[in-house]
Amino acid sequence: MRLTGISHTSFAVSDMDLSLAFYRDVLGMTLIMEIERQGEFIERVVGFPGASLRIVGLKLRSGSDHVLELIEYRVPRGQRIDLRTCNVGSPHLCFVTDDIQSAYEELRSKGVQFKSPPVRIPSGPSAGGFDAYFLDPDGITLELSQPAPSGPRKA
């Protein structure tokens, strides 16, 4: 097997209009795609007979190639799950910034809920950088990360 890249990250959301307003209008991402999917293809892919989905794709305006895909399952309707980061399978997506304090203050002024102010990373490969977790409208954890002055965060 040869994997050649990562296409996108996807989150299931409860209300596409609310999520789109958050990711596009609050975080400043650009809408690159919006489609409705139903029928045999999507039923087979997701494994739900009668599936009907609204899907959007977003990118950062900075030119990053990574796509964030948001999916609202209209059929079947999903259930809320416990998204605390300690739970197995709980996702989070990290956004890199060169000024975490400014980004933190701007997002807080827009009503974004943070788990803490930016925290300095004390040790390890990212020592000297800063991280802060915040939540989207569905409670999905997102992260702001400012790399250490010595260079960008390594994956």
Language-model segments: residues:
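Core segments of cupin and vicinal oxygen chelate
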Residues: 12-64, 109, 125-127, 133
